[in-house]
Amino acid sequence: MISEERLLKVILAPHISEKSTVNAEKNNTVVFRVAIDATKAEVKAAVAQLFEVEVDSVRTLVNKGKTKRTGARVGRRSDWKKAYVTLAEGADIDFVGGAE
């Protein structure tokens, strides 16, 4: 079992984009920014416990940070990890929280 403290550190934020919105509508898949060292099992457990939904599958990828210039200096943005979480039929996560 994963500790409560670790579960809260795994999911950083929902990743809202045009692609993630289409995925949510068509495939019942939500996208999260997660900790770079998080495993698929940790992401699955965190989503299941924090949002009280059943998770079918988790797919992860690491986005490499871009090289950026500020004047003469060259820097690099941090790498970050994204997780596509497919929910079970009938499960839903509402990030907007609008009144029903």
From Swiss-Prot:
Give the range the annotation lists for the signal sequence: none
User: rRNA-binding as a keyword?
Assistant: yes
- Listed GO MF terms: rRNA binding; structural constituent of ribosome
Domain of life (superkingdom): Bacteria
Which GO annotations describe the biological process of this protein? translation
Instruction: Spell out the disulfide connections.
Output: none
Keyword set, alphabetical order = Ribonucleoprotein, Ribosomal protein, RNA-binding, rRNA-binding
Give Gene Ontology CC terms. Answer: ribonucleoprotein complex; ribosome
Q: Where are the coiled-coil regions?
A: none
Any Pfam family the entry gives: Ribosomal_L23
Looking up SUPFAM superfamilies in the UniProt record yields:
Ribosomal proteins S24e, L23 and L15e (SSF54189)
Query: What does this protein do, in the record's words?
Result: One of the early assembly proteins it binds 23S rRNA. One of the proteins that surrounds the polypeptide exit tunnel on the outside of the ribosome. Forms the main docking site for trigger factor binding to the ribosome.
The record's note on quaternary structure and interaction partners says: Part of the 50S ribosomal subunit. Contacts protein L29, and trigger factor when it is bound to the ribosome.
Q: Which family does it belong to?
A: Belongs to the universal ribosomal protein uL23 family.
Report the PANTHER family cross-referenced here. Answer: 60S RIBOSOMAL PROTEIN L23A (PTHR11620)
Q: List the protein's name.
A: Large ribosomal subunit protein uL23
Q: Which organism is it from?
A: Shewanella pealeana (strain ATCC 700345 / ANG-SQ1)
Identify the coding gene: rplW
